[in-house]
Amino acid sequence: MANAALIEALRAADAVQFGEFELSHGGTSSYYVDKYLFETDPRCLKLIAEAFAERVADDDKLAGVALGAVPLVAATAVETNKPYVIARKKAKEYGTAKRIEGALDEGEEVVVLEDIATTGQSAVDAVEALREAGAVVDRVVVVVDRQEGAAELLADHDIALESLLTAEDLLADADG
């Protein structure tokens, strides 16, 4: 069953919007889930961190995909008292020039936390970077799965997709 409190919080934060929107992959949609509105809303952030915490195993290290999932993974780290790493899309060209920020040991089991899954490509990229760094990753947990192919793409890379909410959950009974 969908998390009714989280749905209500996302709607109250105006994070679910209706109209014509261009998505990051170039497609268009009649609705938009504004991650910046829910990631900067304390009530949403608390509910998300609590829900993510329920899905994290005792031996999991947390990882967040930069930039969008950083507030989510940080809040979940506080909720679970677990350290986390940040997976960048590409290495910085300055400083340490790393794709993975934070301490990560070879063989550590990592669960990736992400904001929204549409195609799933950013999650796949993060998992590949973590695996290249020696992590064992087989699971991504997202706030919202837009149900537009992410689960299938991730499955092709031996990654399970779990979501707190699906587009179907979020749009049920919506006034759009």
Curated annotation (Swiss-Prot):
Residues holding 5-phospho-alpha-D-ribose 1-diphosphate: R88, K89, K92, E114, D115, I116, A117, T118, T119, G120, Q121, S122
Lineage: superkingdom: Archaea
Enzymatic class: transferase
Keywords: Glycosyltransferase, Magnesium, Pyrimidine biosynthesis, Transferase
Known pathway: Pyrimidine metabolism; UMP biosynthesis via de novo pathway; UMP from orotate: step 1/2
Family matches, as InterPro entries: OPRT (IPR023031), Or_phspho_trans_dom (IPR004467), PRibTrfase_dom (IPR000836), PRTase-like (IPR029057)
Cofactor needs: Mg(2+)
Amino acids binding orotate: T118, R146
Family to which the UniProt record says this protein belongs: Belongs to the purine/pyrimidine phosphoribosyltransferase family. PyrE subfamily.
Name of the protein: Orotate phosphoribosyltransferase
Species name: Haloferax volcanii (strain ATCC 29605 / DSM 3757 / JCM 8879 / NBRC 14742 / NCIMB 2012 / VKM B-1768 / DS2) (Halobacterium volcanii)
